[in-house]
Amino acid sequence: MLGKDYMLAIILVNCDDDLWGDHSLEVEAGLPPGWRKIHDAAGTYYWHVPSGSTQWQRPTWELGDAEDPGTGTEGIWGLRPPKGRSFSSLESSLDRSNSLSWYGGESYIQSMEPGAKCFAVRSLGWVEVPEEDLAPGKSSIAVNNCIQQLAQTRSRSQPPDGAWGEGQNMLMILKKDAMSLVNPLDHSLIHCQPLVHIRVWGVGSSKGRDRDFAFVASDKDSCMLKCHVFCCDVPAKAIASALHGLCAQILSERVEVSGDASCCSPDPISPEDLPRQVELLDAVSQAAQKYEALYMGTLPVTKAMGMDVLNEAIGTLTARGDRNAWVPTMLSVSDSLMTAHPIQAEASTEEEPLWQCPVRLVTFIGVGRDPHTFGLIADLGRQSFQCAAFWCQPHAGGLSEAVQAACMVQYQKCLVASAARGKAWGAQARARLRLKRTSSMDSPGGPLPLPLLKGGVGGAGATPRKRGVFSFLDAFRLKPSLLHMP
């Protein structure tokens, strides 16, 4: 986002009109310092020159304002606002500060329901996104490109037909199962987006774009996928984390409802029916993604996670032998399993895989110091960890995003299994309580046996599954995109 001083320089350089003799700019008596009354085709409004804010209402004096309007601001009072700008009742809600200091803000926040979260944002507009760009491995790049495109061109491009909110300051409210965008002045609703209809959301990954937030959703009128981009007054990771928490809550509630209604509905809950808990990726695809890569090998490591551990292992594998000794492989990544077959033997189904790892065992992934290298750490059980590394062309970003998406699917499955287990445990406890109430003290009937939990794997595999996936998500939730260089 361009700073106010830089924007002021652009206005001064690119404006050829007489800035000092414009009769549309009136210095009206009684206005607070820095305010100008303006008449143009849009009507009559008031412009605060130092901050660039505009509003239809006449500004009022505040305690501490100087009595002489010309004091300290006379040198810039002759400036006009940027040409071609239109003003509407919604666009009058521009920033007066970098925080939520809008009129009635504190009382409005206090009136919201418990658990709701507020963020001050400015809409940068939207860009259409093709469906194929939301596939795992592509969505991160697509969303980041949308953020960069709107961030770089918003000052000189016109909003597309049907765009809502471009250039406006808004209040983004996250509560229950919806994201609401509200006018910060009159608290009117601008847009309401159900969370379950959001396909992807993300945070800007380029330098200086950490306050840019974007989400992709289908427009109900045009039936196209739109990536909406916002600039936030706080690091956008806070919005992404809040969305993740709300989606986890929705997931848990739906699992409970499904458990209560299991006797009435034979259909199990499907991951397609759940909100997509993603950051810069779509984590619900069940189809395997395939990538060509050079298999560098595996190496035991001492810790389950850490970029330093991963970089050290990749460095050791890189220095161990010649690049010509690395095996060209076709790496297949699904929501449950990663498999590497030699390319010459990939067509043969009977050939043993060169390397294989269940996604549930992954504890850490990352791109190495060389952007061509990708590594992951797997939990083999009994405090034993192993790093596997691959060399990718043109870079390891696509493979990293695909594995990241697979881990998110496993995380969803763990949440579903955990909620279902808690529901079964509660049902058994209630049944045991009813039995105690209806049986005599000397009843020969013993306590009800607890059901055995059966998951995708049994025995010793259950513990690494939870430890691997949840430890990976703990690290993933607190870090930026894994496409970042260490």
From Swiss-Prot:
SMART domains: PTB, WW. May modulate the internalization of amyloid-beta precursor protein. Expressed in various tissues, highest expression in brain. One of its GO terms (cellular component) is membrane. Pfam families: PID (PF00640), WW (PF00397). This is Amyloid-beta A4 precursor protein-binding family B member 3. One of its GO terms (biological process) is positive regulation of protein secretion. Residues 113-280, 285-440 form the PID domain. GO terms for molecular function: amyloid-beta binding; low-density lipoprotein particle receptor binding; molecular adaptor activity. Residues 29-61 form the WW domain. Keywords: Cytoplasm, Nucleus, Repeat. InterPro entries: APBB1/2/3, PH-like_dom_sf, PTB/PI_dom, WW_dom, WW_dom_sf. Interacts with APP (via intracellular domain). Interacts with APLP1 and APLP2 (via intracellular domain). It is found in: Cytoplasm; Nucleus. The lineage of its organism: Eukaryota, Metazoa, Chordata, Craniata, Vertebrata.
